[in-house]
């Protein structure tokens, strides 16, 4: 693969993200990493785009230089959003997404693959950001779900405490709503 792109929220970067990002950087000459929901900060997006960018850099920068971070705002308009992403990322050999809606939007523009078809089985980690945020909100172990450097950053920067104060109760309440 030459140019690969993806857009995720990275809230926070977890071990599943790390496995995907490392695999893409190993297999691609250039990886364009979209920081989705860059214009949102709420219970589903509790970390700023700059904070998410720092998490990705902590994971990738010690080993790779073939990646670029791109801010991708939400537009609340799928067709406009896909056109924006295409404009920001340009031509790609591959676009990667786990999100069915994003897959539908991007398939007319790119060859699209699910991360599960790219990450080798021995690296696959079944974690999502919702699980990490729920554990943070409950005060349970979340550190084992994220790369060590990310855990240290989240704690040292006071981001876990801030998340718990600002969005902890809302995160827990979301579990109760079907």
Where do the model's predicted regions map?
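Nucleotidyltransferase catalytic core that binds NTPs
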Residues: 1-178
């Amino acid at each position: 693969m030459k140019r690969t792109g993806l857009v995720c929220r990275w809230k926070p970067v977890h071990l599943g993200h790390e496995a995907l990002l490392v695999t893409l950087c190993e297999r691609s000459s250039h990886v364009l990493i979209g920081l989705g929901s860059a214009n949102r900060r709420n219970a589903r997006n509790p970390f700023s785009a700059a904070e998410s960018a720092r998490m990705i850099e902590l994971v990738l920068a010690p080993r790779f230089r073939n990646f670029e971070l791109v801010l991708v705002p939400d537009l609340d308009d799928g067709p406009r959003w896909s056109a924006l992403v295409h404009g920001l990322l340009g031509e790609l050999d591959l676009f990667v997404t786990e999100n069915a809606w994003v897959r539908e939007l991007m398939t007319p523009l790119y060859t699209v693959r699910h991360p599960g078809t790219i990450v080798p089985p021995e690296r696959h980690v079944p974690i999502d950001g919702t699980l990490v945020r729920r554990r943070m909100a409950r005060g349970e172990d979340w550190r084992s779900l994220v790369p060590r450097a990310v855990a240290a950053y989240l704690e040292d920067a006071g981001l876990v405490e801030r998340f718990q104060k600002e969005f902890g109760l809302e995160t827990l309440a979301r579990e109760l709503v079907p």
